[in-house]
């Protein structure tokens, strides 16, 4: 089941302390907003509309660099007006229903929460994740003694909250009771049926300065590191240059293959695909397809990186080993590292390129071909 998303990111977040609004702050190396955008795209969102301020629009291209399937619109003076602006900005193409409204200050959206919401809409007009209240509640009016409040039947509402677009538009149009605290309140007032699904303790809202310290810890819980490895080999043939790790090297032979035979890029592509469970390079670029005859292998690697991004993941580091008697790799190693960093969009200090020989043993030792191995670490949503 497909869906679309409106992420409300137009607030000032003053309770979170001085400095940038909380949705633009960096959490475990990435902007708070990016966490939820990546999660929704990885779960299959047809489109994500980010509702922001005029100042925020300047941040978005940098904050969401490399992500496809999102766009922005300007919000209003209140959350309700911003939600309505986001609903108006959604396309009406197939796959845009239902709509999930989400607060940008809740970075840890899980696939399980999203799927539960989609399933609950078959019997409700709006579904939202919620947690049962576990703490004892106290009420203390000004100047009076504290009183215990029963927590029976009380739930803590979270976002995203899911409903059909026309349901939300009609409910907001009919709302006349001031500023609502969430979308469920608006739909409920319009006579809609509300369903609660299992909430997630990780789906905490960043409101106060101390919340960010806890979120830094939770970020490690909400992400997993996956490792992939790849291997490739090509035989030598007549030629005047060889491509290795995206760099052309003058040589008295070339590597023979269907594409440009860049064994370094092929091994690295396979390692990335392996880390995210997406098969191997032959599945995506079959050697039987004439389209890829003589193709530059950097496009294969970029495709693998795009798949990582689409899953809400990020490359941590890569390590490539070239196995050959010649050409000498050391004079070109830094250029290879820089080219790989450029293709992968990661800092060069996260890229390693090494070379070794097999001491004259085997096909590489006899000078019949060159081999490459690669290992990568990829961070993805848990």
UniProtKB/Swiss-Prot annotation:
Give the protein's biological function: Bifunctional enzyme that catalyzes the formation of 4-diphosphocytidyl-2-C-methyl-D-erythritol from CTP and 2-C-methyl-D-erythritol 4-phosphate (MEP) (IspD), and catalyzes the conversion of 4-diphosphocytidyl-2-C-methyl-D-erythritol 2-phosphate (CDP-ME2P) to 2-C-methyl-D-erythritol 2,4-cyclodiphosphate (ME-CPP) with a corresponding release of cytidine 5-monophosphate (CMP) (IspF).
Q: What EC number(s) does this enzyme carry?
A: 2.7.7.60, 4.6.1.12
Site positions (Transition state stabilizer) are: 15, 22, 258, 357
UniProt keyword terms in alphabetical order: Isoprene biosynthesis, Lyase, Metal-binding, Multifunctional enzyme, Nucleotidyltransferase, Transferase
Q: Which InterPro entries match?
A: IspD (IPR001228), IspD/F (IPR026596), IspD/TarI (IPR034683), ISPD_synthase_CS (IPR018294), MECDP_synthase (IPR003526), MECDP_synthase_CS (IPR020555), MECDP_synthase_sf (IPR036571), Nucleotide-diphossugar_trans (IPR029044)
Write down the required cofactor(s): a divalent metal cation
Question: In this chain's numbering, which residues are marked as the site (Positions MEP for the nucleophilic attack)?
Answer: 151, 205
Gene Ontology terms: biological process: isopentenyl diphosphate biosynthetic process, methylerythritol 4-phosphate pathway; terpenoid biosynthetic process
Q: Which reaction does it catalyse?
A: 2-C-methyl-D-erythritol 4-phosphate + CTP + H(+) = 4-CDP-2-C-methyl-D-erythritol + diphosphate; 4-CDP-2-C-methyl-D-erythritol 2-phosphate = 2-C-methyl-D-erythritol 2,4-cyclic diphosphate + CMP
Q: Mark the transmembrane ranges.
A: none
At which positions is a divalent metal cation bound? 232, 234, 266
Pathway(s) = Isoprenoid biosynthesis; isopentenyl diphosphate biosynthesis via DXP pathway; isopentenyl diphosphate from 1-deoxy-D-xylulose 5-phosphate: step 2/6; Isoprenoid biosynthesis; isopentenyl diphosphate biosynthesis via DXP pathway; isopentenyl diphosphate from 1-deoxy-D-xylulose 5-phosphate: step 4/6
Protein name from the UniProt record: Bifunctional enzyme IspD/IspF
For the region 2-C-methyl-D-erythritol 4-phosphate cytidylyltransferase, give the residue spans: 1-225
Please tell me where 4-CDP-2-C-methyl-D-erythritol 2-phosphate binds in this chain. Answer: 232-234, 258-259, 280-282, 356-359, 363, 366
What's an example of a GO molecular-function annotation for this chain?
metal ion binding
Give the UniProt family note: In the N-terminal section; belongs to the IspD/TarI cytidylyltransferase family. IspD subfamily. In the C-terminal section; belongs to the IspF family.
Q: Where is the segment annotated 2-C-methyl-D-erythritol 2,4-cyclodiphosphate synthase?
A: 226-382
């Amino acid at each position: 089941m497909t869906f679309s998303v409106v992420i409300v990111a137009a607030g000032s977040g003053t309770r979170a302390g001085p400095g940038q609004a909380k949705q633009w702050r960096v959490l475990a190396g990435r902007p708070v907003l990016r966490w939820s955008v990546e999660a929704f795209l990885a779960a299959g969102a047809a489109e994500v509309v980010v509702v922001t301020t005029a100042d925020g629009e300047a941040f978005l291209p940098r904050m969401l660099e490399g992500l496809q399937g999102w766009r922005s619109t300007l919000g209003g003076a209140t959350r309700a007006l911003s939600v309505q602006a986001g609903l108006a900005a959604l396309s009406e193409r197939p796959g845009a229903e239902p709509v999930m409204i989400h607060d940008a200050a809740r970075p840890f959206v899980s696939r399980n929460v999203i799927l539960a919401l989609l399933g609950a809409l078959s019997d409700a007009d709006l579904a939202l994740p919620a947690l049962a209240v576990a703490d004892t509640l106290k009420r203390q009016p000004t100047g009076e003694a504290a009183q215990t409040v029963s927590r029976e039947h009380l739930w803590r509402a979270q976002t995203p909250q899911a409903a059909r677009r026309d349901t939300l538009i009609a409910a907001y149009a009919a709302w006349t009771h001031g500023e609502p605290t969430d979308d469920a309140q608006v739909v409920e007032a319009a006579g809609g049926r509300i369903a609660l699904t299992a909430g997630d303790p990780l789906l905490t809202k960043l409101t106060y300065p101390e919340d960010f310290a806890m979120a830094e810890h939770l970020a490690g819980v909400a992400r997993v590191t996956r490792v992939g490895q790849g291997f490739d080999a090509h035989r030598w043939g007549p030629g005047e240059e060889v491509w290795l790790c995206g760099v052309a090297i003058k040589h008295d032979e070339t590597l023979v293959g269907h594409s440009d035979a860049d064994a370094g890029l092929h091994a690295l592509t396979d390692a990335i695909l392996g880390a995210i469970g997406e098969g191997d390079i032959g599945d995506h670029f079959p050697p039987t397809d004439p389209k890829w005859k003589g193709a530059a292998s950097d496009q294969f690697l970029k495709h693998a990186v795009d798949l990582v991004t689409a899953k809400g993941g990020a490359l941590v580091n890569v390590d490539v080993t070239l196995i050959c008697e010649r050409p000498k790799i050391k004079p070109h190693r830094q250029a290879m590292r820089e080219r790989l960093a450029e293709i992968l969009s990661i800092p060069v200090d996260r890229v390693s390129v090494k070379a070794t020989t097999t001491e004259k043993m085997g096909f590489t030792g006899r000078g019949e071909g060159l081999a490459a191995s690669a290992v990568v670490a990829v961070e993805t949503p848990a």
